[in-house]
């Protein structure tokens, strides 16, 4: 009689701990993916500034890569992640 009782208690503890872990994970997912633009902590102007800095940085890296090859920069598109160097070399 003692062995089935201990087994049952152990099983209940195991199931309850797994259930609490699953509930915590599901509530974390809800917190992560909920986004409301009206209560957003991001300032659109600072976000736009970060995008400009990213674009300048990407095109600067593109120009450096072209210079290492001894070529001029031809096109740089941050949106399409496109960097093209000229065909002719630097004279």
UniProtKB/Swiss-Prot annotation:
It is found in: Secreted. Keywords: Disulfide bond, Secreted, Signal. GO terms for cellular component: extracellular region. The keyword Nucleotidyltransferase does not apply. InterPro entries: DEFL_AtLURE1-like (IPR047497). Coiled coil: none annotated. Pollen tube attractants guiding pollen tubes to the ovular micropyle. This is Protein LURE 1.6. It comes from Arabidopsis thaliana. The lineage of its organism: Eukaryota, Viridiplantae, Streptophyta, Embryophyta, Tracheophyta. The gene is LURE1.6.
């Amino acid at each position: 009689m003692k062995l089935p009782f201990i087994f049952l208690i152990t099983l209940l503890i195991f199931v309850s701990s797994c259930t609490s872990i699953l509930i915590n994970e599901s509530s974390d997912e809800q917190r992560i993916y909920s986004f409301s633009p009206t209560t957003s902590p991001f300032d659109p102007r600072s976000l736009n500034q970060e995008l400009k800095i990213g674009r300048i940085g990407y095109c600067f890296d593109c120009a450096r890569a072209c210079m290492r090859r001894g070529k001029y920069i031809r096109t740089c598109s941050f949106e399409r992640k496109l960097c093209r160097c000229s065909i002719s070399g630097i004279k």
